[in-house]
């Protein structure tokens, strides 16, 4: 699958790849690589005006790469932020001989200054749309009541509740943020809404505070205060005080949460809620790369319960997760299981089946699109019917597989190909320039390559017979895919030294005489070479290191 192309992919030269050295290369290795390329590209070695001009351009590029990597400060900047970091304004005021950590802090300071100038243009919109569906007529149908009713052959599926909420943030200064939010809800024909305004201030690196004002048609004015504070590096506390004004008087509320990191992956929470639905809750949450585990216990009025849940995270490109939970309390028991999966770059689709007493069976479908959430709880039955559980489990899976294979996958493939084509059009001039530079480099290498081949032949050493770089098509590829490779035999032979060829872990597109023939797509390097008179062949991914000759590359000619 093609990889996404960043804006800097063409502009950001890989200096390590150009010099063909490791990212951990010593100053001696850098100097040796620089001298070798200087001997190859020095303008004074070429009499032809065109070759001389091409050699001068390549020589300057090699010199620039060496200047950056040979200076500890510029090398540290380049290693962390790339070529763009070197072009950042403000480095001229940075003192020499700073450590990489100090350089990182300086760069972040310069970035903050730029971000503050664009602060007013930022918002962080978040929204939720929830649509409750009553589909109990599918399973809890009483046929004797519908015998004399016209049109009773079709189940009645209704939307019985809806909820919409939205919020935006408006940074006022580097420490102050205004938040505006609103919500609308309706259930069985009765509805209401509210609007809230909050002002948040970051008081220090250890805490922040927030004032909130709200009003609604069903509830009176609301005044709230939220505080957050890091007590220690491993412990923090949050407090939320609220005053709800109504015709019955003032209803105060207080919620306090104390949290502590038990280890690097585990956090313990202790929550006390007073006022509306008073309760004491304790929970332990463990979150690792492969799983998310929660256990909680609540004692409260009117609801007390125990909860245990587990989520397994698959290490795949689609970030698939499966989860299950058990909740038991005074109001019943609920078992819930489900899964979620990333269906596009910004969208995650999930479904869960909830089985409870006395709640019955429900199917919950959720779609997260960027910062927007769409939630559809579908109530199937008030009873524990095996048929409802079966259809709630199998139905979404079948629908997802069908939609993903017939609609989503073709759509994403078409979008990706369209994006790649647009990128190729936008970068056509840059690619053409790099192609011309690569061809010029190959012409400048011809004389050196001739001498290298003569030396290798005299000792029965390493001869590059053929080498190709780019996108190769195999039997599993789609029919409309085309081979997009370039011949890199001469550039690779030029890198042979003492019957050895060593390429570092970096994109080969940055090597002298190479260029990217298929921007944004996966590439490989295939080499057919001869060593000690025996043919060898190897193929490696673009960013994988290569060292030849190797016995494992030998072509078996006995069969």
Swiss-Prot record:
<dbReference type="GO" id="GO:0005743">
    <property type="term" value="C:mitochondrial inner membrane"/>
</dbReference>
<dbReference type="InterPro" id="IPR036869">
    <property type="entry name" value="J_dom_sf"/>
</dbReference>
<feature type="modified residue" description="Phosphoserine">
    <location>
        <position position="204"/>
    </location>
</feature>
<dbReference type="GO" id="GO:0042407">
    <property type="term" value="P:cristae formation"/>
</dbReference>
<dbReference type="GO" id="GO:0005739">
    <property type="term" value="C:mitochondrion"/>
</dbReference>
<dbReference type="InterPro" id="IPR055225">
    <property type="entry name" value="DNAJC11-like_beta-barrel"/>
</dbReference>
<protein>
    <recommendedName>
        <fullName>DnaJ homolog subfamily C member 11</fullName>
    </recommendedName>
</protein>
<keyword id="KW-0175">Coiled coil</keyword>
<dbReference type="InterPro" id="IPR018253">
    <property type="entry name" value="DnaJ_domain_CS"/>
</dbReference>
<dbReference type="InterPro" id="IPR001623">
    <property type="entry name" value="DnaJ_domain"/>
</dbReference>
<dbReference type="Pfam" id="PF11875">
    <property type="entry name" value="DnaJ-like_C11_C"/>
</dbReference>
<feature type="domain" description="J">
    <location>
        <begin position="14"/>
        <end position="82"/>
    </location>
</feature>
<comment type="similarity">
    <text>Belongs to the DNAJC11 family.</text>
</comment>
<comment type="function">
    <text>Required for mitochondrial inner membrane organization. Seems to function through its association with the MICOS complex and the mitochondrial outer membrane sorting assembly machinery (SAM) complex.</text>
</comment>
<keyword id="KW-0496">Mitochondrion</keyword>
<comment type="subunit">
    <text>Associates with the mitochondrial contact site and cristae organizing system (MICOS) complex, composed of at least MICOS10/MIC10, CHCHD3/MIC19, CHCHD6/MIC25, APOOL/MIC27, IMMT/MIC60, APOO/MIC23/MIC26 and QIL1/MIC13. This complex was also known under the names MINOS or MitOS complex. The MICOS complex associates with mitochondrial outer membrane proteins SAMM50, MTX1 and MTX2 (together described as components of the mitochondrial outer membrane sorting assembly machinery (SAM) complex) and DNAJC11, mitochondrial inner membrane protein TMEM11 and with HSPA9.</text>
</comment>
<keyword id="KW-1000">Mitochondrion outer membrane</keyword>
<keyword id="KW-0472">Membrane</keyword>
<dbReference type="InterPro" id="IPR024586">
    <property type="entry name" value="DnaJ-like_C11_C"/>
</dbReference>
<keyword id="KW-0143">Chaperone</keyword>
<dbReference type="GO" id="GO:0001401">
    <property type="term" value="C:SAM complex"/>
</dbReference>
<feature type="modified residue" description="N-acetylalanine">
    <location>
        <position position="2"/>
    </location>
</feature>
<dbReference type="GO" id="GO:0061617">
    <property type="term" value="C:MICOS complex"/>
</dbReference>
<keyword id="KW-0597">Phosphoprotein</keyword>
<dbReference type="GO" id="GO:0016607">
    <property type="term" value="C:nuclear speck"/>
</dbReference>
<dbReference type="Pfam" id="PF22774">
    <property type="entry name" value="DNAJC11_beta-barrel"/>
</dbReference>
<keyword id="KW-0007">Acetylation</keyword>
<dbReference type="InterPro" id="IPR052243">
    <property type="entry name" value="Mito_inner_membrane_organizer"/>
</dbReference>
<feature type="coiled-coil region">
    <location>
        <begin position="415"/>
        <end position="457"/>
    </location>
</feature>
<dbReference type="Pfam" id="PF00226">
    <property type="entry name" value="DnaJ"/>
</dbReference>
């Amino acid at each position: 699958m093609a990889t996404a192309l960043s804006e800097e992919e063409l502009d950001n030269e890989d200096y390590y790849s150009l010099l063909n050295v490791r990212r951990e290369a010593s100053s001696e290795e850098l100097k040796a690589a620089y001298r070798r390329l200087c001997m190859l590209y020095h303008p004074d070695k070429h009499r032809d005006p065109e070759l001389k001009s091409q050699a001068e351009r390549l020589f300057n590029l090699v010199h620039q790469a060496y200047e950056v990597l040979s200076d500890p400060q510029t090398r540290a900047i380049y290693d962390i932020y790339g070529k763009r970091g070197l072009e950042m304004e403000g480095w001229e005021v940075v003192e020499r001989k700073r450590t990489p950590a100090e350089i990182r802090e300086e760069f972040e300071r310069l970035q903050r200054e730029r971000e503050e100038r664009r602060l007013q243009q930022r918002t962080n919109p978040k929204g939720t749309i929830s649509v409750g569906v009553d589909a109990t007529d599918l399973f809890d149908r009483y046929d004797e009541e519908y015998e004399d009713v016209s049109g009773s052959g079709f189940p009645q599926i209704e939307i019985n509740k809806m909820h919409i909420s939205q919020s935006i943030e408006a940074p006022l200064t580097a420490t102050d943020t205004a938040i505006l939010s609103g919500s609308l809800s309706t259930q069985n024909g009765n509805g209401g809404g509210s609007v809230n305004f909050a002002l948040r201030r970051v008081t220090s690196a250890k805490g922040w505070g927030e004032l909130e004002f709200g009003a609604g048609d069903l509830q009176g004015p609301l005044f709230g205060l939220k505080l957050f504070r890091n007590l220690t590096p491993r412990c923090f506390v949050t407090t939320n005080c609220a005053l709800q004004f109504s015709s019955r008087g003032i209803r105060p509320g207080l919620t306090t949460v104390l949290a502590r990191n038990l280890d690097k992956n585990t956090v313990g929470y202790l929550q006390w809620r007073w006022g509306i639905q008073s309760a004491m809750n304790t929970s332990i949450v463990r979150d690792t790369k492969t799983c998310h585990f929660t256990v909680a216990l609540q004692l409260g009025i009117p609801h007390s319960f125990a909860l245990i849940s587990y989520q397994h995270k698959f290490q795949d490109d689609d970030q698939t997760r499966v989860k299950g939970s058990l909740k038991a309390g005074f109001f019943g028991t609920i078992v819930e299981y489900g899964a979620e999966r990333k269906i596009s770059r910004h969208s995650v689709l999930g479904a869960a089946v909830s089985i409870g007493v006395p709640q019955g069976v429900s199917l919950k479908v959720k779609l997260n699109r960027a910062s927007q959430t769409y939630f559809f709880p579908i109530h199937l039955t008030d009873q524990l019917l095996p048929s409802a559980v079966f259809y709630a489990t199998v139905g979404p899976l079948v629908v997802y597989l069908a939609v993903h294979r017939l609609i989503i996958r073709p759509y994403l493939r078409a979008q990706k190909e369209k994006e790649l084509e647009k990128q190729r059009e936008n970068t056509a001039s840059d690619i053409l320039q790099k192609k011309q530079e690569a061809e010029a480099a190959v012409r400048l290498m011809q004389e050196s390559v001739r001498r290298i081949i003569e030396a290798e032949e005299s000792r029965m050493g390493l001869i590059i017979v053929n080498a190709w770089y780019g996108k190769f098509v195999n039997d599993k590829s789609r029919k409309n895919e085309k081979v997009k490779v370039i011949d890199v035999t001469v550039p690779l032979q030029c890198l042979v030294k003492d019957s050895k060829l060593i390429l570092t872990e970096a994109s080969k597109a940055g090597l002298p005489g190479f260029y990217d023939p298929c921007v944004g797509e996966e590439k490989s390097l295939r080499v057919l070479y001869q060593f000690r008179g025996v043919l060898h062949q190897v193929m490696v991914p673009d960013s994988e290191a290569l060292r030849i000759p190797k016995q494992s590359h030998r072509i078996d000619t006995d069969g």
